[in-house]
Amino acid sequence: ECTSIMSDVNWSTTRAYGLGINGLYLNLRGRERDGIVEHGAERENLLNELVTRLTAVKDVDGQSVIRGVYRADKIYAGDATALAPDLIIGYRRGYRASWQTCLGNLTPEVLLDNDSVWSADHCADALEVPGLLCCNQIIRADNPSLIDLAPSILEDFGLQKPQAMTGRSIFTA
């Protein structure tokens, strides 16, 4: 038997909800079973409000907790975008969603110290985490990007990149 982690949520008044480590979803009419947020102006206003309020969150020392909040419809493309959270939270280095939050629970505190031995994860804003790619081939592309990895791997295995996939091979100029 399965128990819903959000069984106590009053969906008739919930405009947005978090699921996972850094995704926020709007309770959209037509997409969610009990959606209340209308597409159009109401959706846009709520997205803007959430971005503004989240980027204003500070810790007890007055430091910003969130570097950026990104709209899926602005950073993703393709058919799978509909499956993505409406907003992706990019935490500053040293901050993340709590373990309880990731599981759909609420804690009395807004911010908690991480007293776990786990000290690294993928909640951080991509601009906070430098990347490094080690490979045994010459990278011929100028200014390669993360979105270029999947097409590069496919090419290396002799497979065609799907038409809807963004990015390009880093191994060809």
Where are the model-predicted features located?
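Short, well-ordered loop/turn and helix-capping segments at boundaries between secondary-structure elements
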Residues: 56, 155-162
